[in-house]
Amino acid sequence: MKTARSASPQTEEDLPLILDKLYFERGWDFRDYKATSLKRMLLKRLSALNVPTYKDYLDILEKDPEEYNELFSCLMVKVSEFFREPEAFSYLHGELPRLTLSGQGLKAWCAACATGEEAYSLAMLFTESLSPESLQKTKVYATDICPGALDSARKAVYRDESLVNVSPAMKEKYFFPHGHAHKVKYSIRNLVRFGCHDLVKDWPLAKVDVLFCRNLFIYFNKPLQDEVFKKLDSALKKGGVLALGKAEVLPQPFSSSYSRLGPGANIYRKTG
C-alpha cells in the first residue's frame, strides 16, 4: 500500500503547481519559500490524508475548496514561546534608556507574530522597564498573515510549555489562571494591537523603534529575503533595534548599516 512518503522526486514538478493554485485561488503566496521547508511541511498534510503524491493532492484541491484552508495552516510556522532566545530581550533591555530619552514612548513591530507570545513578551519587558510616562506612549503592533494565529493571539491563553522562560514572579504579575492554562492580563494585552499583514505583498509600518522578525527568513529564498528585508529596513528608524532569528543573517546590501549588540543573540542597532 502506498503512503505519503512515496511523494518522490518524480512528482516534485507538481509542487509549484500546488503553490500556484494556492496563490491564484486564495492570494496566499508561498512560491518563493524554500522548497525544502515547504516539502517537509506539506508531507505532514499528505501523511494525514494518506495521499501518496503531490498529483493526488492536486486532485483533492480541485474537489474540495476547503482544503485550501488546511494547506495554508499546514504551511504556516506557529512555533513560539514567551521570551524565546532570552538574550535578545536582555540586549533590548539595555537599549531602552537610549530609545526613550526625554520620556518618549516606543513604537514596536512584531512582524510574523504567530500566536502572540513574542508580542506580549515585548509588552511585559516595556512594562517592567519604562517609566510610566514612556509606557503610556508605547504600543506594540503585532502582525501575521494567518487569521487563525491572530485569533489565538487575541485570546491570549497559553499552556505551561509556552511559559518556560517566564519567572514565577512575572507569571503571577502578568497572567491569571484560565482552566488548565494561563491568560495574559489586560494591562499587557492593552499594549498590543494585532492585525493581518503579508510581509511579501503589503506595505510595511513606518517610524518603528523596535522591530522583531525572527525565524521567518529561514523559509524564504535569497531574492525574497532581500525583498522583504528592504521593507523592514525602511520601517525601522535610524538608531532603532532589529531582532532576527539565531539562524538568520543580515542580507549583504544592508549589513554595513547595522551594528550587532553583542554575542549570543541576533539583535542589532541600525546605524545607517
Name what the model sees in each region.
Residues 115-133:
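Conserved SAM-binding loop of SAM-dependent methyltransferases across substrates and taxa
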Residues 132-212, 216-227, 249-250, 256-258, ...:
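Extended basic-aromatic, gly/pro-enriched interface segments that bind polyanionic ligands
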Residues 2-109:
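Conserved AdoMet
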Residues 103-121, 139-141:
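Conserved class I S-adenosyl-L-methionine
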Residues 262-267:
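Short hydrophobic/aromatic beta-strand or adjacent loop that forms the aromatic wall/cage
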